[in-house]
């Protein structure tokens, strides 16, 4: 028979009384009523707040969007293969946040900030809410510093400043992403942190872009946020806000940042899909009523901060895809009205061989003029007007048999200006090279050069300056002005290159 020792029992009881923890954990738990198409209807989450993160029992996360009388409509941020009718759902009391910090540079992440490039975890402890309020009026200052894209036609005619929102708009396959990638490549050595947000794109396209950035040494200062075409609509909807949050971290540290949203049309379509499945009333083109707010609250986060706030900036280049050049559709008109100007790319110009295919007539930068460097502003003032007039004359001259000499001369110069502004992909030019090329065209110094030789002339001019006039390039890059001495040097170089070229033609 087992002997019972009272002292042992009392010591066990004492131990249990000492270790007794009477803390009670209260969690708000609900039950899945219905699930499908990335949407869950949940009963019982009485205390949940709009936009709150939810946790399903298989670990999938969701966001509560519709708070109704008898149920909550939530979107799922994953496959949710383990979630079924009757599954438990817990509210977390948190809003979606994303990891931020220096360690994010050079990495490819999903909209939740999780790495998807196979390089392991990101060593950062800082986080930031995905949805943040935009800086107020007092925290901002006007745009006054240039954000050089390296693309001559943009920097000369549609300049972009740090803290500006400049829309890139055009049909599919007209070179919208190419302009954005060139701008990222041109920030090398400028101490600008870039964030490229790919929304609803093919995984192969994103992999190709990452490889291009890596080859040109641009991935070191770039964060790529990707929500592929196969991802749930909720992740495609969140991706731009994640990109903005990552850039905001650097902006509030006083750094210049550049964010590319490629493209917001697909984000709007993902949001429309979610809204219709949540049974929200459809409006124009079946988009929900708050689709304007979807984009305005995102793009308002781009700003040039005041000196008291550290002087950082976030420049946003949203991309919008049009159908058959129709800029009067719902989403294009919304984003045009929110942004500080647009760069319009034309399929006709692209197919005619003009690349970048910028339609100068309807492209505009509303605030970038104040940020343009004096060197390029001095010589490019008439460039936009001349090209716009050339387009009109070119259309008119197709029907006119005999043209007067002045018109003929204007047409010839316009053709040469067009050729000068052609630029291959992934080859951004610095300020001095742009000044030299534009000066040669605007001042009529290459009117004698045959049109088909203009591109070759521009290349030779740039090479000559690099080899023989390095001090000219240094002076322009340092002073950002074209004084009389530099202008005389430039004219001399242009004439020299032109003479040697015409001698061989």
UniProtKB/Swiss-Prot annotation:
Q: Does the entry feature the keyword Membrane, yes or no?
A: yes
Spell out the coiled coil positions from the record. Answer: none
Cysteine disulfide partners in this protein = none
User: Which residues of this UniProt protein bind ATP?
Assistant: 170-177
UniProt EC number: 7.1.2.2
Q: Where in the cell is it found?
A: Cellular thylakoid membrane
Give UniProt keywords alphabetically. Answer: ATP synthesis, ATP-binding, CF(1), Hydrogen ion transport, Ion transport, Membrane, Nucleotide-binding, Thylakoid, Translocase, Transport
Q: Which CDD domains match?
A: ATP-synt_F1_alpha_C, ATP-synt_F1_alpha_N, F1-ATPase_alpha_CD
Specify the domain of life of the species encoding this protein.
Bacteria
Alphabetized Pfam families for the sequence: ATP-synt_ab (PF00006), ATP-synt_ab_C (PF00306), ATP-synt_ab_N (PF02874)
Gene3D superfamilies to which the protein is assigned, alphabetical: 2.40.30.20, ATP synthase alpha/beta chain, C-terminal domain, P-loop containing nucleotide triphosphate hydrolases
Molecular functions (GO terms): ADP binding; ATP binding; proton-transporting ATP synthase activity, rotational mechanism
The annotated site for Required for activity falls at 363
Tell me, in one coarse class, where this protein mainly resides: membrane
Membrane topology (UniProt): Peripheral membrane protein
Q: Which reaction does it catalyse?
A: ATP + H2O + 4 H(+)(in) = ADP + phosphate + 5 H(+)(out)
- Gene Ontology CC terms, in alphabetical order: plasma membrane-derived thylakoid membrane; proton-transporting ATP synthase complex
- List, alphabetically, the NCBIfam families matched: atpA, PRK13343.1
Record text on subunit structure and interactions: F-type ATPases have 2 components, CF(1) - the catalytic core - and CF(0) - the membrane proton channel. CF(1) has five subunits: alpha(3), beta(3), gamma(1), delta(1), epsilon(1). CF(0) has four main subunits: a(1), b(1), b'(1) and c(9-12).
Q: Which PANTHER family match?
A: ATP SYNTHASE SUBUNIT ALPHA, MITOCHONDRIAL
Its job = Produces ATP from ADP in the presence of a proton gradient across the membrane. The alpha chain is a regulatory subunit.
Q: Which family does it belong to?
A: Belongs to the ATPase alpha/beta chains family.
- The protein, known as: ATP synthase subunit alpha
């Amino acid at each position: 028979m087992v002997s019972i020792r009272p002292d042992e029992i009392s010591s066990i009881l004492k131990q249990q009384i000492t270790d007794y923890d009477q803390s009670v954990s209260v969690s708000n738990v609900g039950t899945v009523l219905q699930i499908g198409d990335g949407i869950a209807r949940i009963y019982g989450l009485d205390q949940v707040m709009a936009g709150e993160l939810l946790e399903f029992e298989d670990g999938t996360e969701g966001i509560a969007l519709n708070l109704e009388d008898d149920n909550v409509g939530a979107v799922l941020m994953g496959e949710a293969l383990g979630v079924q009718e009757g599954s438990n759902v817990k509210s977390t009391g948190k809003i979606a946040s994303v990891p931020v910090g220096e360690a994010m540079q050079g990495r490819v992440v999903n909209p939740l900030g999780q790495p998807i490039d196979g390089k392991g975890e990101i060593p950062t402890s800082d986080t930031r809410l995905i949805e943040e309020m935009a800086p107020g009026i007092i925290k901002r200052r006007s745009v006054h510093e240039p954000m050089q894209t390296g693309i001559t036609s943009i920097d000369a005619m549609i300049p972009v400043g740090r803290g500006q929102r400049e829309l890139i708009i055009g049909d599919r396959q007209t070179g919208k992403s190419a302009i954005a990638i060139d701008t990222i490549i041109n920030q090398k050595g400028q101490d600008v942190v870039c964030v490229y947000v790919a929304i609803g794109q093919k995984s192969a396209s994103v992999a190709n872009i990452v490889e291009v950035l890596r080859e040109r040494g641009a991935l070191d200062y770039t964060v790529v946020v990707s929500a592929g075409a196969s991802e749930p609509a909720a992740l495609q909807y969140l991706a731009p806000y994640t990109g903005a949050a990552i850039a905001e971290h650097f902006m509030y540290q006083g750094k210049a940042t550049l964010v590319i949203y490629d493209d917001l049309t697909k984000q709007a379509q993902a949001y429309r899909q979610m809204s219709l499945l949540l049974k929200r009333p459809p409006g124009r083109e079946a988009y929900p009523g708050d689709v304007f707010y979807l984009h305005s609250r995102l793009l308002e986060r781009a700003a040039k901060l005041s000196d008291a706030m550290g002087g950082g900036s976030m420049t946003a280049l949203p991309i919008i895809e049009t159908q058959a050049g129709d800029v009067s559709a719902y989403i294009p008109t919304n984003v045009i009205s929110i942004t500080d100007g647009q760069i319009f790319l034309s399929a006709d110009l692209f197919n005619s061989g003009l690349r970048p295919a910028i339609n100068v007539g309807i492209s505009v930068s509303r605030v970038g003029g104040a940020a343009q460097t004096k060197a390029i502003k001095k010589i490019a003032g008439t460039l936009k007007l001349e090209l716009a007039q050339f387009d009109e004359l070119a259309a008119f001259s197709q029907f006119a048999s005999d043209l007067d000499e002045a018109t003929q001369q204007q047409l010839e110069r316009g053709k040469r200006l067009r050729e000068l502004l052609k630029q291959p992909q992934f080859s951004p030019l610095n300020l001095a090279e742009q000044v030299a090329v534009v000066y040669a065209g605007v001042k009529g110094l290459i009117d004698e050069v045959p049109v088909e030789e203009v591109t070759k002339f521009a290349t030779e001019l740039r090479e000559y300056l690099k080899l023989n006039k390095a001090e000219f390039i240094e002076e322009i890059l340092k002073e950002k002005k074209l004084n009389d001495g530099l202008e005389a040097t430039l004219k001399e170089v242009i004439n020299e290159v032109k003479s040697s070229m015409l001698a061989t033609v």
